[in-house]
Amino acid sequence: MGLSDMARTMATADVLRRCLDRWQDWQLATPLDSPPKMGALIAQGSGHSVYGIASTPQLIGRIRHQSTRLTDEAFSQELIIWSLAAQNGLAPRIVYADEKEQAVICERADTAAQAASGEALGTLCRRIYALPGVSHQLTLASDIEHYLKRLPAHLADPWRAAMHAGNAETALAALAADTLYLCHNDLTPGNLMSHGDQLIAIDWEYAAMGSRYFDVAIACEALPDSERGIMMRQVFGDALDDELMTAGKQIAGLVTALWQCCFAIDEAPSPAEWLGSSGY
């Protein structure tokens, strides 16, 4: 562990300890009768550190250690949608949140025993799309521009050229004109958990009103080819729009690639690879 990693771990642990000190404010069905203790670091992603908490019921603490958010309001917006999803059995229930520190204590969900099937993932999507709408929308064009501006010119310029060659603006316009639904927009394998025999989602950071075709395309990226068609049929049935699905796949691949360029450069494809996967 490097010095910066150690400092980051110490800082997030300090934030969690302050949350633990507020244990009597936690919203639990049965209040704790003694102070909880901080457990081990369970996971560390690009933006969050996740710690176990020694308590009954089993809880975890999610602490932000690096900003990957696109707006200042993103955390409060995430809490609104996360709470809504939890009320409908689609996410772990939040028991405490500190908006200043961007820290959350929530119920601990189980890691899925096996990779989600297309049918299970499609069912989860349909249940999310049935939730009431919220006020904020996914802004794909400005999000893409945000990522491009984070990159040095020698990286950003080839991406802009590839976007132009691939007619990304046309795909973005098609998605922007689609009917809006509440979407998770980041249903990647690491954000899928289980509660009993049901698939649920964590990390609602990018959730907003948007096109289901972008959301499904993001979720499909990790599925085997044989499961992708099953998922699409589960969500859209006979109403599947092939042109919108193509646009969703193209922009999902672009957003994922640019996010990787900013936060996980070793995983990022080249602009030419993205263009090739888009059929150009």
Language-model features: where?
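ATP-binding pocket architecture of kinase catalytic cores
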Residues: 40-139
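Conserved N-terminal boundary motif of the eukaryotic protein kinase catalytic domain
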Residues: 32-41
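Hydrophobic packing residues in well-ordered alpha-helices of helical domains and bundles
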Residues: 75, 121, 161-165, 245, ...
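An alpha-helical support segment within catalytic cores of ATP-dependent transferases
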Residues: 15-33, 133-185, 195, 241, ...
